[in-house]
Amino acid sequence: MTLLRDLGMNSIRLRVWVNPSDGWCNKSDVVAKAWRAHQLGMRVMIDFHYSDVWADPGSQYKPAAWIGLSLDELKTAIADHTKDVLNALKEKGITPEWVQVGNEITPGMLWDEDATVSGATYDVPKEGVTYAKNEKNFADFITTGSNAVKEVFPNAKVIVHLHDGNNNGTYRWIFDILKANNTPYDVIAMSLYPGTDNWQEMVAACVANMEDMVSRYNKEVMIAEVGMPWDEPEISKSCLTELIAKSKAIEQCLGVFYWEPQSYGSWNGYTLGAFDESGKPTVALDAFNQ
């Protein structure tokens, strides 16, 4: 964390899993990391996945302990989990500036085959199973998480986060659903993973999307995730420099987070970090210190 701060990063984004098998990213782990960041003077974002494992466009599975709950019980579980983690931070004197309620939730969240308790935004076919669409539940789950955040930290900004930040149609679809359901939130956050051969086009589309979200929904915006191939550091630096500059030009844009900067080389099969195989940061991260 100290190295990343010295490289120009002033904020950290920490994911929360409900009951991970190895303990990483559970409540105590998140509090420990947030405390370290707090001691370094960094701003903190908490990212609730509402899952025991990674939640992303291909995986929005319920925590094992929540399977079989009724709709009301599920909402209670969302609220209790959210408040439990945030109160643990509060007890340590840590105030997160932003809180995500769900991670890359374009296909919804807390999938279930039973439409009455599913939060999918469309019928999601996965491995011979179809997780049922229920837009109302999807919006209600976000509302539940948002209200829980505000109960503990009234001034924290609630984030709704989708993938494919360059896809304006997707964002209009999801945020029209939330608007129709009067869902409370503060910030629209995006992921963007450009290729080395199309980054100019993707950055331009993402910036246009941010501008449209500000205009259409009167919300602040943010890049919650951006990543580029670690072994193309100069191209990555050019992309990040342009994205950061254009984001700064949007008054309502709150910032840009890299994910996952300290992933080195192709560690664990992931190639979009910003450290090389020797464990040193590449020049890509110079973009954060300009």
What are these regions (language model features)?
Residues E151-V158, G165-S236, A245-K248, C253:
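Glycoside hydrolase catalytic-domain groove-lining segments
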Residues M1-R5, I78-A88, N168-N181, C239-K246:
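Short, acidic/polar
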Residues T116-E127, A205, D212-N218, D231-Q290:
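Aromatic-rich peripheral "rim/lid" segments of glycoside hydrolase catalytic domains that contact
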Residues S21, D197, G265:
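Short glycine-rich, flexible loops that bind phosphorylated cofactors or substrates
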Residues R15, G102, S191, V256-W259:
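Conserved residues at the C-terminal ends of beta-strands
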Residues T2-V158, H163-G165, E232:
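Substrate-binding cleft and catalytic face of glycoside hydrolase catalytic domains
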Residues M1, V31-A34, S146, F175, ...:
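Short amphipathic alpha-helical segments and helix-helix/interface helices
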